[in-house]
Amino acid sequence: FKIALKKVKMLLRKNPEADFISISQNDVPERCHCKNCKALEEKYACSGAPVFWFADKIARAIKDEFPKVAVEILPYVYSDEPPKGLVFSENIAIRFTTMNFCREHQLTDEKCKYNLKQKANLDGFAKLTNNLYIWDYAANFYNYLMPIPQLYSLYWNFRYYMEKGARGIMVQASGASDDGAFDRMWNYALGKLLWEPYMD
């Protein structure tokens, strides 16, 4: 903890304009299975508990020196379930990722049991912070040339994010290829939708 805290403070002192610092898991599907991490997972009833607990500890340690900085956590892949019993510091920001969402249905579609689980996760995180952000996806990362029919679901999901109090939405779309799945049209439509999620 002391090493990470020292590094966080050093980075923030070097970058006084920063509003966020991210304390998040690696971009891999695996996590630590040591006894300490397992104990935190059991205590807070979720796989992301070790990272969330650690980030919260950092947030509490820096809030006096850096009152305008939010410590961002990233519920992602294995850590998309909210912790039970962990009360976050007010300077925690949650950037909820939609990696595990079904792309064919909107989040509130009761016929999609998969998305109803993800909706419950998002709702749970929204209750834990006033600093909710969304990291959404609009690409087929397995094959950039394949279309991904989700504009309709994004349209309704963006509205739902706003209803849950999201302060910002970022969409990771395809940028790897100019000729994949109407990328330029997608980016134009997403830009318009992000600017005005309640458009008709």
PLM features per residue range, with description:
Residues 5-41:
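Active-site groove signature of glycoside hydrolases
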